[in-house]
């Protein structure tokens, strides 16, 4: 999965997919009542990027729905996975459940069109704080209450705080999550970061009793870093320049080992050689 980083304006969806992304990451900011408000990152952000592009969250969802609905004039067949980077750190811990409920309602209405031919992309809820695990339970309960528990088949999870992997496992246990787990590791492109924790996550993914299904590394701009991440065995790379990742994947060393994921590839299944 080549994951376009910080795609917060509708116009950027086409821009990133046309550069080779089959997945995008979108920032979601919340108001003080835990309503998802804008697709917005803010300053500071990655070096070399504009930090302030944004849309109202529900408006962005409507644009995203068009981009991921076959038959729509804006349909992008290659776009199969969306990571919502939930900026829930602005909330109190006891608001996490509400944030999950409100997020589910927004998606149900504006993206899934209440189960009536909405967007088809798989969705990852990426949460920065382990203490906010109730965001997941709130989200799940709401889809159930609203009569669409089947949409949870399209939803996966990530804790993005680079926490100790054992602690991440405990948070999932509290949230009642078994499966659909993506594990991120990374840092802003302005700073270097080694691959030690990525390798730990990959080892968990590949062990018989691991809880992780997929591992992604962020944010990668350089060919050398891309090669390092691929050599470590990641499933996804988040990038400001998706074409760089696509170029490396076409090199002879990688072309036979990796291919770009399509809609037919289940993002919740651990890849087995």
Curated annotation (Swiss-Prot):
Record's cofactor remark: Binds 1 Mg(2+) ion per subunit.
Catalytic activity reported: an N-(acyl)-sphingosylphosphocholine = an N-(acyl)-sphingosyl-1,3-cyclic phosphate + choline; an N-(acyl)-sphingosylphosphoethanolamine = an N-(acyl)-sphingosyl-1,3-cyclic phosphate + ethanolamine; a 1-acyl-sn-glycero-3-phosphocholine = a 1-acyl-sn-glycero-2,3-cyclic phosphate + choline; a 1-acyl-sn-glycero-3-phosphoethanolamine = a 1-acyl-sn-glycero-2,3-cyclic phosphate + ethanolamine
Compartment annotation: Secreted
Name of the featured protein: Dermonecrotic toxin LdSicTox-alphaIB3aiii
A single BP term in Gene Ontology: killing of cells of another organism
Tissue: Expressed by the venom gland.
Main localisation: secreted
Keyword Protein biosynthesis among record annotations: no
Cofactor: Mg(2+)
Matching InterPro entries: PLC-like_Pdiesterase_TIM-brl (IPR017946)
Residues annotated for Mg(2+) binding in this entry: 25, 27, 85
Disulfide bonds: 45-51, 47-190
Family that this chain belongs to: Belongs to the arthropod phospholipase D family. Class II subfamily.
Gene Ontology MF term list: lyase activity; metal ion binding; phosphoric diester hydrolase activity; toxin activity
One GO term describing the cellular component: extracellular region
Described purpose of this protein according to its UniProt entry: Dermonecrotic toxins cleave the phosphodiester linkage between the phosphate and headgroup of certain phospholipids (sphingolipid and lysolipid substrates), forming an alcohol (often choline) and a cyclic phosphate. This toxin acts on sphingomyelin (SM). It may also act on ceramide phosphoethanolamine (CPE), lysophosphatidylcholine (LPC) and lysophosphatidylethanolamine (LPE), but not on lysophosphatidylserine (LPS), and lysophosphatidylglycerol (LPG). It acts by transphosphatidylation, releasing exclusively cyclic phosphate products as second products.
E.C. number(s) listed in UniProt: 4.6.1.-
Keywords: Cytolysis, Dermonecrotic toxin, Disulfide bond, Hemolysis, Lipid degradation, Lipid metabolism, Lyase, Magnesium, Metal-binding, Secreted, Toxin
Catalytic residues, chain numbering: 5, 41
Gene3D superfamilies per the UniProt record, alphabetical: Phosphatidylinositol (PI) phosphodiesterase
């Amino acid at each position: 999965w080549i994951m376009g980083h910080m795609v917060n304006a509708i116009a950027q969806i086409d821009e990133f997919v046309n550069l080779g992304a089959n997945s995008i990451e979108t920032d979601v900011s919340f108001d003080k009542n835990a309503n998802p408000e804008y697709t917005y990152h803010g300053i500071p952000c990655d070096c070399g990027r504009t930090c302030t592009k944004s849309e109202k969250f529900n408006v962005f969802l409507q644009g995203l729905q068009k981009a991921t609905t076959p038959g729509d004039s804006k349909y992008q067949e290659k776009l199969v996975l969306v990571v919502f980077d939930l900026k829930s750190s602005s909330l109190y811990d006891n608001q996490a459940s509400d944030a999950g409920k409100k997020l589910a309602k927004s998606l149900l209405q504006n993206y899934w069109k209440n189960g009536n031919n909405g967007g088809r992309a798989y969705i990852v809820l990426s949460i920065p704080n382990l203490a906010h695990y109730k965001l997941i339970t709130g989200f799940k309960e709401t889809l159930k209450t609203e009569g669409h528990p089947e949409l949870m088949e399209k939803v996966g999870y990530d804790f993005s705080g680079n926490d100790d992997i054992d602690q991440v496992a405990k948070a999932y246990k509290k949230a009642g999550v078994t499966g659909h787990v993506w594990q991120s590791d990374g840092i802003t492109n302005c700073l270097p970061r080694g691959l030690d924790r990525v390798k730990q996550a990959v080892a968990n993914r590949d062990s018989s009793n691991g809880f992780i299904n997929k591992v992604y590394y962020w944010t990668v701009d350089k060919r050398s870093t891309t090669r390092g991440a691929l050599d470590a065995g990641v499933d996804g790379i988040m990038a400001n320049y998706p074409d760089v990742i696509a170029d490396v994947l076409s090199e002879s060393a990688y072309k036979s080992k990796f291919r770009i994921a399509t809609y037919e590839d289940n993002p919740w299944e651990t890849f087995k050689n």
